[in-house]
Amino acid sequence: MQSWHSTVLARLARAYHASTNGFERFTGMASTRWRLLFLVHSKGVCTQKDLTLQIGVDAGSITRQIKVLDHEGLVARNPHPEDNRLTEVRLTESGLEAVRRVQEQRAVFLQEMMKGCSAKEIDTFLVVLDRIAGNLNQPDFLQILDN
């Protein structure tokens, strides 16, 4: 086995945690909160079910987080006009201001985080990440555990 095999997951995890922690410290906003606000912003209006599917966490977790955002005045929740089982979520003016503020800070953060990396290196990194994600999403990927 090649030497990088023993460190690739640990290095990837450390880089992810460092970037998430750095983002949260720099912007003052938790990354999960940012993901929710940004998704609602990008969709305009969406259901909590849509958010659950997009983010990939359980519905209860999304509901709790959306309730907090609603209580803080960042989002508004309303029953879906055609299906009362669903709840629509949209940004309030305060939520839109928060998204705009964090988008500006995020751009600065990403610029600093990627400092010293060429455009070619970043493109290669993104290709590798996409390939890893594609491999992990293959239906037969977990068959390696059966061997």
Where are these regions (language model features)?
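Charged, amphipathic alpha-helical coiled-coil/dimerization segments
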Residues: 67-127, 134
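Short capping segments at the starts of secondary-structure elements
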Residues: 43-47
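Short alpha-helical elements of helix-turn-helix
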Residues: 6-9, 29-38, 49
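N-terminal leader segment of winged-helix/HTH proteins
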Residues: 1-27
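Pre-recognition alpha-helix immediately N-terminal to the DNA-recognition helix
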Residues: 18, 35-38, 97
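C-terminal regulatory/oligomerization modules of transcriptional regulators
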Residues: 1, 120-147
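Residues within helix-turn-helix
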Residues: 48-49, 60, 67, 87
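Short, locally clustered residues in the helix-turn-helix/winged-helix DNA-binding domain
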Residues: 13, 38-42, 103, 130
